[in-house]
Amino acid sequence: MSVTSEVQGLRALNEVDPEIAELIRLEERREADTLRLIASENYVSRAVLEATGSVLTNKYSEGYPHKRYYEGQQQVDVVEELARTRVAKLFGADHVNVQPYSGSPANLAVYLAFAQANDTIMGLGLPAGGHLTHGWSVSITGKYFKSVPYGVRESDHRIDLDQVRDLARAHRPKLIWCGTTAYPRTLDFAAFRAIADEVGAILAADIAHIAGLVAAGVHPSPVGIADVVTSTTHKTFRGPRGAMILCKKEHAGAIDKAVFPGLQGGPHNHTTAAIAVAAKEASEEGFRAYARQIVVNAQALGRALESRGFRLITGGTDNHLLLIDMTPKGIAGKPYAQALDRAGIVANYNSIPFDPRKPFDPSGLRIGTPAVTSRGMGVAEMERLAAWMDEVAQNVNDEARIARIAAEVAELCRGFPAPGIRL
């Protein structure tokens, strides 16, 4: 083996690092042979994968298009401009920034743009379905700001807008978040806007979970209502692991300055390219049909589970996810999620509103339909899935039965090939 080939990196992955190559192969097989119900996961297209793994990862590009600190940006500037203009057109936004590395940095940029340390902020509490970065105590956002969390009603587990209004009037927050990670109902952005206006707060909408549904017109859009909108670019958007910030024209300078140089250095250009590809895909009619089917499947799965004795938080869903209280089934969320995983059905245990159990061993399970819908599955498959989930719930310790279900799941998966995976 020549020194030149060693230094130049001419060898393939399976030659250089067979251990990592084998782990990737095993992950491809796992993703192909299991039903992925984690609401924040999805399959990206082959085109998105190709962009993510491109030579654009080699280029450093501090700054913004045509205002860089490095030369050699001829292609990169065009890539970023395409990503920004495609996202702006898709959502009807005045201004777009596609440089945040992920959802949490995007949210931190919003704080940097609009708030000072110790300012009061409001967001949905984590136990009620909110996100860590909306001011929860263990997050840096809960340590650097005075966080006033709002919640959901105990009667129906829907966001308590009366409480939001009362808390806003009492605490006069600088910033109000409306966004969720485990909330299956439509968000009333206009109601949040009215509350923010009453107290003079900036309204920030975090649509990380529902961006694909918003882009397709399946969920109401906060663009033009909220001052600023953040989102990851994976989940229902089916893009790479990145993020984007959409805002009104008057906030463009503050947002861009907060992202760079406020929080980050050079953007990940390979991710930017993949965001551009995902935005192009999301603009097509096929994506709109796909987004509609996500919701149809989630509602069908919810009905099928409810008919089998599962208790759905809020009684159903308007979007891509379901939150389930496992108490009536006599099993906690964690052991149930682990049993499902052995059966080839991948979900995550999750706290439910007013959960008496601890977060690492909660009462609930969160599931979503983006990934199974990406495989082309429909209502009939949701019925089969509910039957398997019920069988597992009743036979958590029956490993022979669970192994049989796993084999049946793998057989179903072979009929619906996973996008982007070539075995």
Curated annotation (Swiss-Prot):
Catalytic activity: (6R)-5,10-methylene-5,6,7,8-tetrahydrofolate + glycine + H2O = (6S)-5,6,7,8-tetrahydrofolate + L-serine
Pathway the protein acts in: One-carbon metabolism; tetrahydrofolate interconversion; Amino-acid biosynthesis; glycine biosynthesis; glycine from L-serine: step 1/1
Main location: cytoplasm
Pfam family, one: SHMT
MF GO annotations: glycine hydroxymethyltransferase activity; pyridoxal phosphate binding
Modified residues (N6-(pyridoxal phosphate)lysine): K235
Keyword Transferase (UniProt): yes
GO (cellular component) term, any one: cytosol
Broadest EC class assigned to this enzyme: transferase
Site for Plays an important role in substrate specificity, residues: H234
GO BP annotations, alphabetical order: glycine biosynthetic process from serine; tetrahydrofolate interconversion
Keywords: Amino-acid biosynthesis, Cytoplasm, One-carbon metabolism, Pyridoxal phosphate, Transferase
Subcellular location: Cytoplasm
Keyword presence, Cytoplasm: yes
HAMAP family per record: SHMT
Quaternary assembly: Homodimer.
Family to which this protein belongs: Belongs to the SHMT family.
Role summary: Catalyzes the reversible interconversion of serine and glycine with tetrahydrofolate (THF) serving as the one-carbon carrier. This reaction serves as the major source of one-carbon groups required for the biosynthesis of purines, thymidylate, methionine, and other important biomolecules. Also exhibits THF-independent aldolase activity toward beta-hydroxyamino acids, producing glycine and aldehydes, via a retro-aldol mechanism.
Name used for this protein in its record: Serine hydroxymethyltransferase
Native species: Sorangium cellulosum (strain So ce56)
Lineage per the UniProt record: Bacteria, Pseudomonadati, Myxococcota, Polyangia, Polyangiales
